[in-house]
Structures are given as structure tokens and as C-alpha cells.
């Protein structure tokens, strides 16, 4: 089972951009687990699968397979502040999040860029480690108030 880190990174970024961040339903497949949403993206021997539960607050896991063997995973949990309940506001925050996630780069492939600002929202991501083992926290703020937060961790499986 041989693949280069460059090929893996290119695939991971393409998969993330084509799934949740794309804002479309083209990659939604029937979920393996009851009550979950499942997104998948395949290119050659690589398969990306994102399975999550919830909406305003959610928990999920991304897994990358190579030749049908799981090789990398990231678990995550987070959501909008509990005081935010209006569907329109939640929708606007998640639309901004998707825009931020489209800005991921090979040196920051887990979520979005270190910082990103558009309109009233500011996205920030603080992570540590590398592809083999990492963890981090992303936030969205508005007028110096955190309105969304998510924690994540993962790495290559051994």
C-alpha cells in the first residue's frame, strides 16, 4: 500500500472542497448509521467519508481510505453558541463556515485557514501537530463574541 504524502494531501483538500464546503448535495449518500448524514468523495484508490450527526451542534468523523483500507481519520464536535436559535442566523454562520473551509491549504488541510474574514464574521483556526497526529480548535466570532466553536483531532492510523 504505497501513496505519496503529496497525493494524499491533494486528495484530502479536493475531497473537503467537494463535500461539506461545496454546499451541494451531490456527494450525500445513504448513511450507514441511522440518523447520520454521510458525504463521500472518491478519486482513484482514495475514498473520503464524512459521517456526522446533528445540525446546530454536531459530532462527526472524517475517514480517508486507500485501496479500501482506512488510513487517516479526524473526529470533530462543535456548533453554534446555544443562545443562537434562529434558523436564518444559524444558516448564515454555516454558509460563512463553508466559505472559510474552501480556503484550506496543504499546510493547513484539517479545516480552514488560520484566519479568514468576510462581512461581519471572523474565522480563526488554531492547530498543533502534523498530518500524523494533530488537534485543533476553530471559532467564528462576530463583534468580538464567539458564536461558533469546534474542536477536532486525528491523524494517520497505524
Where are these regions (language model features)?
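Cysteine-centric segments in proteins
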Residues: 1-158
Amino acid at each position: 500500500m504505497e501513496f505519496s504524502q503529496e497525493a494524499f494531501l491533494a486528495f484530502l483538500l479536493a475531497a473537503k472542497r467537494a463535500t461539506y464546503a461545496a454546499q451541494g448535495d451531490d456527494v450525500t449518500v445513504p448513511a450507514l448509521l441511522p440518523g447520520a448524514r454521510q458525504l463521500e468523495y472518491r478519486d482513484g484508490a482514495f475514498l473520503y467519508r464524512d459521517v456526522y450527526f446533528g445540525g446546530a451542534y454536531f459530532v462527526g468523523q472524517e475517514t480517508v481510505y486507500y485501496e479500501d483500507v482506512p488510513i487517516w481519520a479526524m473526529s470533530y464536535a462543535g456548533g453554534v453558541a446555544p443562545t443562537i436559535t434562529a434558523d436564518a442566523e444559524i444558516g448564515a454562520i454555516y454558509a460563512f463556515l463553508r466559505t472559510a473551509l474552501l480556503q484550506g491549504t496543504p499546510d493547513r488541510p484539517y479545516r480552514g485557514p488560520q484566519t479568514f474574514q468576510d462581512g461581519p464574521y471572523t474565522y480563526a483556526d488554531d492547530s498543533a501537530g502534523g498530518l500524523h497526529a494533530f488537534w485543533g480548535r476553530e471559532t467564528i466570532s462576530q463583534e468580538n463574541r464567539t458564536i461558533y466553536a469546534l474542536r477536532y483531532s486525528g491523524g494517520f492510523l497505524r
